[in-house]
């Protein structure tokens, strides 16, 4: 693809000036990486663990990290024949030995345990893995990361600046990050896009024309069909889609971001102005102008990692909306926000109240057996306003069980399908507040969320 020259060179240079690590930053990073590698080797020797390799992976090892980010991924590589139990036990022993010199340490768990530490100001993951022959013969999901590292390092040379530009551009568009909270583009996916298209400009131009189902297979070795919006076949594993975590909405948000940028390139696409928290007065004005009903389900945030929490929150969000639909409330939109100590599921409805009367339509009168059963059920029953025939069918006007959305959620939310930890937290206590009452929620981050919401 021809290089697109419509993006001003001085704009790219201005962005790089802000995001490209300085030589001093690089030297500090390299020194810390070398020190960490030495600490891991010393810990393994002290604990009599033989045949350990230390591998630096991730953007810091590939030269595609943004200035100001202090993340280092250290993989502690064990021989392939090591048992999983031994890898986890001995790997964590080594990690904890290294952590003795850290400012902070925290056990984390993906497919198997790893240790997150703060070491000389850097956020460091110490991850045990198996040293397998190829990314197609994995013993655990993290085993593929060193292969990603080698592929990118051998193909990205000379295009590191393009990766930096793309990462910051995606950040500006709110689509960077493959964690389940964001459902956006991972760093590895971003690097592969640059490798495939050749530059930042070419990638932006190409993305303007994408459609769901777009497939990119750099090595031309795909073995499987995928149904995700974007399919980036992993160059190291033909069965894997690197873009599997990317949601349809984030895929489309990126396309829109690219199109708007190409119309009028500017720094604001990389560095959008920060949003201020929404003031009470502004929220009340929005309530008055929108004339809708706003509900907030508030409960204590479960003490679990985001990648476990957010799928459960999205499940709860969908379950709450489905419950409201089932009882005739019209949902305009839903959203979730989570902080410490509270989590909020937001719902906007056309109206939070419905009439006390509800129309129940039965079968045609001539379908005798079913029609008579329907009539017998409602005729003369309590909470029935009256009955008649309309359009050849029995109709009864009955009293609505839940005329308010708030009452419905308070009484039926716990009967919905909720994730394990979220259900436990909601069961311990939740509150449904509506409209002006939402002003009680003062967390500044929530108020920024609220500004986007309204």
UniProtKB/Swiss-Prot annotation:
Q: Does the keyword ATP-binding apply?
A: yes
Q: Which CDD domains match?
A: NT_2-5OAS_ClassI-CCAase (cd05400)
Q: What are the alphabetically sorted keywords of the record? A: ATP-binding, Magnesium, Metal-binding, Nucleotide-binding, Nucleotidyltransferase, RNA repair, RNA-binding, Transferase, tRNA processing
Q: Which GO terms describe its biological process?
A: RNA repair; tRNA 3'-terminal CCA addition
EC number of this enzyme: 2.7.7.72
Q: Which reaction does it catalyse?
A: a tRNA precursor + 2 CTP + ATP = a tRNA with a 3' CCA end + 3 diphosphate; a tRNA with a 3' CCA end + 2 CTP + ATP = a tRNA with a 3' CCACCA end + 3 diphosphate
Please list the cofactors this protein needs.
Mg(2+)
Q: What class of enzyme is it?
A: transferase
Q: Tell me which residues bind CTP.
A: 59, 62, 148, 167, 176
Q: Which residues of the sequence carry a binding annotation for Mg(2+)?
A: 71, 73, 125
Listed GO molecular functions? Answer: ATP binding; CCA tRNA nucleotidyltransferase activity; magnesium ion binding; tRNA binding
Q: Which residues bind ATP?
A: 59, 62, 148, 167, 176
Additional remarks: A single active site specifically recognizes both ATP and CTP and is responsible for their addition.
Q: Which family does it belong to?
A: Belongs to the tRNA nucleotidyltransferase/poly(A) polymerase family. Archaeal CCA-adding enzyme subfamily.
- Role, per record: Catalyzes the addition and repair of the essential 3'-terminal CCA sequence in tRNAs without using a nucleic acid template. Adds these three nucleotides in the order of C, C, and A to the tRNA nucleotide-73, using CTP and ATP as substrates and producing inorganic pyrophosphate. tRNA 3'-terminal CCA addition is required both for tRNA processing and repair. Also involved in tRNA surveillance by mediating tandem CCA addition to generate a CCACCA at the 3' terminus of unstable tRNAs. While stable tRNAs receive only 3'-terminal CCA, unstable tRNAs are marked with CCACCA and rapidly degraded.
Q: How does it assemble?
A: Homodimer.
Recorded protein name is CCA-adding enzyme
């Amino acid at each position: 693809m021809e290089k697109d020259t419509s993006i001003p060179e001085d704009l790219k240079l201005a962005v790089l000036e802000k995001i490209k690590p300085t030589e001093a930053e690089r030297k500090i990073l390299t020194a810390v990486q070398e020190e960490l590698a030495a600490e891991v080797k010393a810990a393994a020797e002290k604990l009599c663990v033989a045949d350990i390799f230390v591998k630096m992976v991730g953007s810091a090892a590939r030269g595609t990290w943004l200035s100001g980010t202090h993340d280092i991924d250290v993989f502690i590589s064990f021989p392939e024949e090591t048992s999983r139990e031994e890898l986890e036990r001995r790997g964590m022993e080594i990690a904890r030995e290294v952590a003795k010199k850290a400012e902070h340490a925290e056990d984390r768990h993906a497919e198997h345990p790893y240790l997150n530490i703060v070491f000389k100001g850097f956020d460091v993951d110490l991850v045990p893995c198996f040293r397998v022959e190829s990314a197609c013969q994995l013993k655990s999901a993290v085993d593929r990361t060193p292969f990603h590292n080698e592929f990118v390092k051998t193909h990205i040379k000379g295009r590191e600046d393009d990766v930096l530009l793309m990462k910051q551009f995606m950040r500006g568009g709110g689509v960077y990050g493959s964690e389940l909270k964001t459902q956006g583009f991972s760093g590895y996916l971003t690097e592969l896009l640059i490798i495939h298209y050749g530059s930042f400009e070419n990638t932006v131009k190409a993305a303007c024309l994408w459609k769901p189902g777009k497939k990119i297979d750099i090595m031309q070795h795909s073995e499987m069909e995928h149904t995700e919006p974007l399919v980036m076949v992993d160059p190291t594993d033909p069965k894997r889609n690197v873009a599997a975590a990317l949601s349809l909405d984030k895929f489309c948000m990126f396309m829109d971001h690219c199109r708007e940028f190409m119309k009028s390139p500017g720094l604001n696409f990389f560095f959008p102005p920060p949003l201020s928290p929404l003031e009470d007065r502004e929220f009340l004005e929005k309530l008055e102008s929108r004339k809708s009903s706003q509900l907030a389900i508030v409960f204590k945030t479960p003490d679990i990692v985001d990648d476990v929490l957010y799928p459960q929150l999205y499940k709860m969000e969908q379950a709450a909306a489905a419950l409201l639909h089932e009882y005739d409330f019209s949902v305009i939109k839903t959203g979730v926000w989570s902080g410490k100590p509270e989590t909020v599921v937001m719902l906007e409805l056309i109206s939070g109240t419905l009439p006390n009367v509800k129309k129940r339509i039965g079968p045609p009168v001539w379908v005798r057996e079913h029609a008579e059963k329907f009539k017998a059920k409602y005729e003369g029953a309590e909470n029935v306003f009256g009955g008649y025939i309309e359009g050849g069918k029995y109709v009864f006007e009955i009293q609505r069980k839940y005329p308010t959305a708030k009452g419905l959620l308070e009484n039926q939310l716990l009967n919905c399908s909720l994730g394990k930890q979220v259900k436990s937290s909601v069961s311990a206590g939740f509150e449904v507040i509506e409209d002006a009452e939402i002003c009680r929620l003062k967390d500044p981050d929530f108020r920024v969320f609220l500004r986007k919401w309204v």
